[in-house]
Structures are given as structure tokens and as C-alpha cells.
Amino acid sequence: MKAATIARGKLRIGLLVAGLALAGPSTGAASPMLVALTGDGMLITFPAEHPGDARTRKPSGVSGQLIGLDRRPANGLLYGLTAAGDVYTIDPVTAAGSLVSTLTVPFNGGSRSGLDFNPRTDRLRLVGHDGQNLRVNVDNGATAADRPLAYAREDPHFGRQPLIAATAYTNNVAGAETTEMFDLDSGLDLLVRQEPPNDGTLRTVGPLGVHVPPEAGFEIVTDGGGKNRGLAAFASTLYDVDLATGAATSLGTIGGPSGSIVGLSTIAGSP
């Protein structure tokens, strides 16, 4: 992608964020701008504090079914993955996609999976409902297959098959020196830590208090002071997720088309 094209895309994103932030609450802090991917492939953009104030776009230039998306901290661009393993950049304003690479190892998770960039290593993590655990260089598609997901021997859920529906990393900013990886288990309705990520070892944090469907979105927003905030979206509802306990609190219904949410991400320029 040419530098001029990227610059224009970032300008459009900045204008969208600024415009929608004006409609947010006057709390002294701007509301994070989010984009959700629906099960039928639509993009819904909205502020976290007012999820009903949404704009919907249909992606163009993407071949196949999108199964997840995330903003890459290293460059601020939004990336999407298709069921065929193709990686695209996606303009969150126009929803136009541009092919970047293709995974060298097939990912079998489909939309029942988690997808998020590790901000420290600049690699895209993919975790599937079947326990698959991949690490991707999105620039060339080079994919490493790490150890399958499993609960730690000392965890109360050791021996249970994890059914991971979404994943997210803390310290979600460029150049992060440290990060933690969290997953949502839809079989047990839990928030769990994946520690260490490459080993696929899961450790229970706590119950969400709500049912997590097999298709869900999860994002961790890091503000300018380094504070991490968990946000999850499923069944057309946005939730705050306490990363210390797992407790989920509803923030309201997401506007736009009803149905499943399969991905959630911030937009570049959000706090």
C-alpha cells in the first residue's frame, strides 16, 4: 500500500473518530471508537459509551468470508482474516479491503475463534474453538503452529476442552514492552489468561456472569495512562469486562443489524 494512500486513510479515520467522539459523554475522556464484525460480514462502527449510535458498512474488495478483525498497534491499520486464510487491510470508514498476505498454515477455527495482535512482538495470534493456536506475520503470511490450548494442570478446569470464542492482549499500543493475553471460553463462560501464549496454557481468571456464545468479539483498550479496559461484544450487546475478576457489565445494545458478533476492535485514533 502506498504511503499517500495510508495517509489519506488515516485522515478519514481521524475525522470519523473526531466526529463521533463529539456525540460521546462529557466525562473528560473520549469514548473509545470500536468496529464490530457481524456473522454476515458487515462492519458496525460505534463509540463504546453509546453502542446504539452506530454506522454500518459492507466490506468491498474482500474475497470470501471475514471471520475476525483487529487493529495492528504497530501501524494503526485494521486487518481482517477470511475463512480461506487471506489477510486484508480494511478501511473502517469506506470498508474497502486490500489483500496483504495468505497464511502458510490453514486455520480451522472459522468464526468460532479469537484473533488479536500481540503489541510486543507484532504478530497476529489466532486461537480456535478446536484448540488451534497460531502466530502469524501478516506482512508475508508466515505462520507458526504453537502448542494447542489446554488448561494448566493446577487449574480447576484442567482436563476440560477449552472452547475459545475471542482473545485480546493488554497494553494494546505500539512498542509495548509487556503484555498479557486474555481469552473468552464460551463452554465455561469464563475469562481466562493464556500464559504463556505460545504454550497455549490457560489459567482461569473468573466467571463472566453472562453466557458467551461460540461467536464473540473481545478487545482491550489501553488509554494514555496505560490503563487497560476489557470490552466484549456478543448477541448484539457490548460489555465491560473486569480483567481482574472476569465480571461482565452490559453497556447496551449495539446499533445496526441484529445477530452474531464475530470480531471487535478499536479504530486508530481511539484513546
Predicted regions and their residues:
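Conserved beta-propeller blade signature
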Residues: M33-L37, L77-G80, R123-L126, A176, ...
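Blade-level signature of beta-propeller repeat domains, shared across WD40, Kelch, NHL, RCC1
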Residues: L243, A247-P271
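An edge-strand/N-cap motif at the start of beta-rich repeat modules
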Residues: A30-E49
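A short beta-strand motif characteristic of beta-propeller blades
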Residues: G52-G61, A96-P106, A145-H157, T201-V210, ...
